[in-house]
């Protein structure tokens, strides 16, 4: 039913990243999560038949970060998407624990769940499980990255996401600051999604705003770390103008740090931007604060991919993998923000 694919780049190591990658939307966060990585979409080949697709009645969604709001949203929307095709959706309860995730996946293999969509917490450790799934004739779809052993994958335009935010911030810097000022980046270098987003964000900004001084690049993917790292940056650079995050969660922590340091919420000389389309960030953008941009993923698009990619593998489609679209939202995009908020409700 499936074929193995050779990954074009080594996969990432331990990953908490998309726990905060909202949109995944993450959502996100989330999505949130989400990044050695290909700059462009990768597709896994698969073999099979249309009749195999008709027999696909169950899909297992293994999303380990069950404690975040995105999990509930993703399960709800994926269940509805599956139901349209007469498919029941199974879920794990990993509790953000890699050992629990491994145990739950082993159970699914023993039960021969016909299609598994898994967001590995530890990509290297998932290789053996994915290989065992393929050997058992099951479909394995990797969520948020790529494995050597897989039927297909679901990715989120990683590089483009960072590029959109970097470009938006650079344009704002030119318009509001005359191309001068100080910028700090909250980054991730632990997984494919994070590395690609980080590279897109930094490359786009520094290329388009060479007159803005880069004063810090700090690892942060969650609100608490973003808050702490931003406070440390502000202690050295209280006149920081721009803070860009690899996730909305980290950027939102920086947003709060700036306010705690005395920055007014609508300060005309401050720009915060993030990635995922996380609800707090979307609300801050809509309210006209200095949180001015998010590269947002639509939860409906992710949920549809969770169902459509395994179905495409089962049907024998040559390129079953999905690249979930991403779009930039800012203060003028009220309708788009409202639509994203509605999907997360």
Predicted feature locations:
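Extracytoplasmic "Venus flytrap"
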Residues: 56-77, 81, 89-103, 107, ...
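N-terminal export leaders
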Residues: 14-18
